[in-house]
């Protein structure tokens, strides 16, 4: 395998060729930075977090594929992944993970001690998550914690503390993550049942759409509370309305529980997050 082919394998292993996960992780992180700063955050902090989100999402993908390397070959959507297809060894994948994790940790060393402490918890959560699919029916809820961990870190980096407002935003993103990752799990539900992977899509069963709606509603409520605490204005409110519109559209897509529409609903959450962040940024700019 030449260098170009090897780089292609690394890109696919870390999902750099599929940025949806990075974007879903980025929007709440950026929102946290803007809320914490009361507008435009410190440039140094912003750059570190943007790079950190990209790297840590890649880390999560690599360790996820390592944990699932013997299962992915039996799932239609994942059987072409580099570890499952044998394009890269388990040892090499672990080395890639360690290098990226070390790089991410070096980034947070440029910030204050509280951020460094929180980052250690974050990397531990990232390593644990892939294995929760073996032992619990609620891995999406654990993922919600992993994918929301950048929020207290962002507040800590910008303000040196993690105020109550941060935890309302954390709760909002946690509920939102459970909702959209359950949509994602609906795509693989039949295959997951065959190979023994657990998920909320399986746990919720015939009530999946209703429970997803409940999590979407809870996320909206927490986003609204975070906005009220920060005294945000009508533009942020417009972002909330847009988020509601996207949530309703996603419910329409998952109504028939078919794979392609469920995956489309999952992808649509990127636009929901982007709309809410842009509204927040404009709200701070205007008010």
From Swiss-Prot:
Requisite cofactors: Mg(2+)
Topology of the protein relative to the lipid bilayer: Multi-pass membrane protein
Residues that span the membrane, as ranges: 20-38, 95-115, 211-231, 235-255, 266-286
Gene Ontology MF term list: 4-hydroxybenzoate polyprenyltransferase activity
A single cellular component GO annotation: plasma membrane
Pathway in which this enzyme or protein is active: Cofactor biosynthesis; ubiquinone biosynthesis
Its EC number(s): 2.5.1.39
Family: Belongs to the UbiA prenyltransferase family.
Functional summary from the UniProt entry: Catalyzes the prenylation of para-hydroxybenzoate (PHB) with an all-trans polyprenyl group. Mediates the second step in the final reaction sequence of ubiquinone-8 (UQ-8) biosynthesis, which is the condensation of the polyisoprenoid side chain with PHB, generating the first membrane-bound Q intermediate 3-octaprenyl-4-hydroxybenzoate.
UniProt name for this protein: 4-hydroxybenzoate octaprenyltransferase
UniProt source species: Shewanella piezotolerans (strain WP3 / JCM 13877)
Gene (UniProt): ubiA
């Amino acid at each position: 395998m030449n260098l170009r082919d090897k780089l292609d394998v690394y890109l696919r292993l870390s999902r750099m060729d599929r940025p949806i996960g990075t974007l879903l992780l980025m929007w709440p992180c950026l929102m946290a930075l803007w809320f914490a700063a009361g507008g435009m955050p410190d440039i140094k902090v912003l750059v570190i977090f943007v790079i950190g989100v990209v790297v840590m999402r890649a880390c999560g993908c690599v360790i996820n594929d390592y944990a699932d390397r013997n299962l992915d070959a039996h799932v239609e959507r994942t059987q072409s992944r580099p570890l499952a297809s044998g394009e890269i060894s388990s040892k090499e994948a672990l080395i890639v993970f360690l290098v990226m994790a070390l790089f991410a940790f070096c980034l947070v060393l440029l910030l204050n001690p509280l951020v460094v402490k929180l980052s250690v918890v974050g990397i531990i959560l990232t390593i644990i998550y892939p294995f929760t699919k073996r032992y619990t029916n609620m891995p999406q809820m654990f993922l919600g914690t992993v994918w929301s961990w950048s929020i207290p870190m962002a507040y800590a980096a910008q303000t040196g503390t993690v105020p109550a407002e941060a935890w309302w935003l954390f709760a909002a993103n946690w509920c939102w993550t459970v909702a959209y990752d359950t949509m994602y799990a609906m795509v693989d539900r039949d295959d997951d049942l065959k190979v023994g992977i657990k998920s909320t899509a399986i746990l919720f069963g015939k009530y999946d759409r209703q429970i997803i709606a409940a999590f979407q509603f809870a996320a909206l409520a927490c986003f609204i509370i975070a906005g009220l605490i920060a005294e945000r204005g009508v533009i942020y409110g417009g972002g909330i309305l847009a988020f509601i519109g996207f949530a309703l559209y996603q419910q329409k897509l998952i109504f028939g529980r078919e794979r392609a529409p469920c995956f489309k609903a999952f992808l649509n959450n990127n636009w929901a997050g982007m709309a809410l962040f842009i509204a927040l940024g404009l709200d701070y700019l205007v008010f």
